[in-house]
C-alpha cells in the first residue's frame, strides 16, 4: 500500500489541510493519506499549542468521513525531538509492506536541504509537493529530482495561526473549519485567551 504522510501540528486542523489531503488521496499515486500529528516540542514555548491528544482528536473528527485519510499519532511514541528520517525508518520497520512518501508544501521543499539526513529521505522515499504562495526563490535542483512529484493541487492560503487569532478576537471563522472541529473548539473554549 502506498501511504502519503502529511505532517503538521494541526493547531487546529482546517479545511485547507483537508483540501490538500483529499486532493493527494484522489489525484496522486497514493492509496491513503496519514495525517501525522507532530508532538509538542518541549524546548519550544507552548503558548497557544493545544495538548497533543486534543490536536489528535480534532484530526480524528475532521477525517472520520474520509475513507482514504487517516489520523496518525506515530510521532507521539518516538523520542523527541522528532526527525522525519527517524519516523520514516520506524514506519518502514513497523509496516514493511507499505511504501511511505512525504507530502509537503513548496515552501518546505525549499528548506529540505536543511533537514537531518535529507539525502536518505530522497533516496528512499517519494515526495509529493503541493503549491504554496511564496517570495522565496524556487529550489530548481530539488524540484527536478526524480523522487519529487509536483502535484497541481489547489493553492489554499489558510493558516492555523490566522484561525487561532481570529477566534481570540471573537471572529466567526466557522467556514474555515470542519463542522465537528468547530464544535469541539467552541465547546472547549480553545484559543479564546
Swiss-Prot record:
Q: Which UniProt keywords apply?
A: ATP-binding, NAD, Nucleotide-binding, Nucleotidyltransferase, Pyridine nucleotide biosynthesis, Transferase
| Matching InterPro entries | Cyt_trans-like, NadD/NMNAT, Rossmann-like_a/b/a_fold
Per UniProt, the enzyme's principal EC class comes to: transferase
- Report the EC number(s), separated by commas if there are several: 2.7.7.18
Example GO molecular function term?
Answer: nicotinate-nucleotide adenylyltransferase activity
Where does the record locate the signal sequence feature?
A: none
Query: Which GO BP terms, alphabetically?
Result: NAD biosynthetic process
Q: In which pathway does it act?
A: Cofactor biosynthesis; NAD(+) biosynthesis; deamido-NAD(+) from nicotinate D-ribonucleotide: step 1/1
Q: Which reaction does it catalyse?
A: nicotinate beta-D-ribonucleotide + ATP + H(+) = deamido-NAD(+) + diphosphate
- Show the SUPFAM superfamilies listed in the entry: Nucleotidylyl transferase (SSF52374)
NCBIfam families from the xrefs? cyt_tran_rel, nicotinate (nicotinamide) nucleotide adenylyltransferase
Q: What does this protein do?
A: Catalyzes the reversible adenylation of nicotinate mononucleotide (NaMN) to nicotinic acid adenine dinucleotide (NaAD).
Could you say which protein family the record assigns here?
A: Belongs to the NadD family.
Designated name of the protein: Probable nicotinate-nucleotide adenylyltransferase
Amino acid at each position: 500500500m502506498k501511504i502519503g504522510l502529511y505532517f503538521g501540528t494541526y493547531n487546529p486542523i482546517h479545511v485547507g489541510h483537508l483540501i490538500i489531503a483529499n486532493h493527494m488521496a484522489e489525484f496522486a499515486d497514493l492509496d491513503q493519506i496519514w495525517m501525522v500529528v507532530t508532538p509538542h516540542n518541549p524546548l519550544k514555548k507552548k503558548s497557544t499549542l493545544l495538548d497533543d491528544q486534543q490536536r489528535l482528536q480534532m484530526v480524528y473528527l475532521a477525517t472520520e468521513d474520509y475513507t482514504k485519510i487517516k489520523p496518525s499519532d506515530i510521532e507521539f511514541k518516538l523520542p523527541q525531538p522528532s526527525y522525519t528520517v527517524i519516523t520514516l525508518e520506524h514506519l518502514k520497520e513497523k509496516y514493511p509492506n507499505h511504501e511511505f512518501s512525504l507530502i509537503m508544501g513548496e515552501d518546505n521543499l525549499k528548506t529540505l536541504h536543511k533537514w537531518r539526513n535529507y539525502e536518505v529521505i530522497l533516496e528512499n522515499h517519494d515526495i509529493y509537493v503541493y503549491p504554496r504562495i511564496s517570495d522565496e526563490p524556487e529550489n530548481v535542483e530539488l524540484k527536478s529530482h526524480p523522487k519529487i512529484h509536483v502535484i497541481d493541487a489547489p493553492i489554499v492560503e489558510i493558516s492555523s495561526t490566522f484561525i487561532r487569532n481570529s477566534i481570540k478576537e471573537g471572529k466567526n471563522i466557522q467556514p474555515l473549519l470542519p463542522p465537528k472541529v468547530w464544535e469541539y473548539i467552541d465547546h472547549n473554549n480553545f484559543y479564546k485567551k
